């Protein structure tokens, strides 16, 4: 028989830096889950990723106080800002451009994000990422 699910917890946790402090501790503690067990498992899974890169994670909490978690790919905006070499997007994206990225960089980001995107093919994923970049005030060259 399947375990009874008592809830889902969605968090963004820096890769390799999960610790019991907020927001992880309170979110897991409310449901009676073992916080250190999650932190150790998450840090082990994110060992190969760039430290500090925010990773969205969905934790499924079960009635017997056990849990499973699914890691998603980093947010597109974080990857775009990193590729463009900027700290934040433009406050007026359609008038003030703050940086630019090439089509090759957009394709690389789309490849990374493909498992989480609803795009049917690579070209649709590239257009989705390019649209996100434009809405941040970043020019996409070659598109």
Swiss-Prot record:
Belongs to the universal ribosomal protein uL11 family. Forms part of the ribosomal stalk which helps the ribosome interact with GTP-bound translation factors. One or more lysine residues are methylated. GO terms for molecular function: large ribosomal subunit rRNA binding; structural constituent of ribosome. It comes from Azoarcus sp. (strain BH72). It holds the Pfam family Ribosomal_L11_N. Keywords: Methylation, Ribonucleoprotein, Ribosomal protein, RNA-binding, rRNA-binding. GO terms for biological process: translation. Part of the ribosomal stalk of the 50S ribosomal subunit. Interacts with L10 and the large rRNA to form the base of the stalk. L10 forms an elongated spine to which L12 dimers bind in a sequential fashion forming a multimeric L10(L12)X complex. One of its GO terms (cellular component) is cytosolic large ribosomal subunit. Gene3D superfamilies: Ribosomal protein L11, C-terminal domain, Ribosomal protein L11/L12, N-terminal domain. This is Large ribosomal subunit protein uL11. The keyword rRNA-binding applies.
């Amino acid at each position: 028989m399947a375990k009874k699910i008592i809830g889902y917890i969605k968090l963004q946790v820096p890769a390799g830096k999960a610790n019991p402090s907020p927001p992880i501790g309170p979110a897991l503690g409310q449901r009676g889950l073992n916080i250190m067990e999650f932190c150790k498992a998450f840090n082990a899974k994110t060992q190969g990723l760039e430290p500090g890169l925010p990773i969205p994670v969905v934790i499924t909490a079960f009635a017997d106080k056990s849990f499973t978690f699914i890691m998603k790919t980093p947010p597109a905006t974080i990857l775009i800002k990193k590729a463009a070499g900027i700290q934040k997007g433009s406050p007026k994206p359609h008038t003030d451009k703050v940086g630019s990225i090439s089509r090759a960089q957009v394709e690389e980001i789309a490849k990374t994000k493909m498992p989480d995107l609803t795009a049917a093919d690579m070209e649709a994923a590239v257009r989705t990422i390019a649209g996100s970049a434009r809405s941040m005030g970043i020019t996409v060259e070659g598109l």
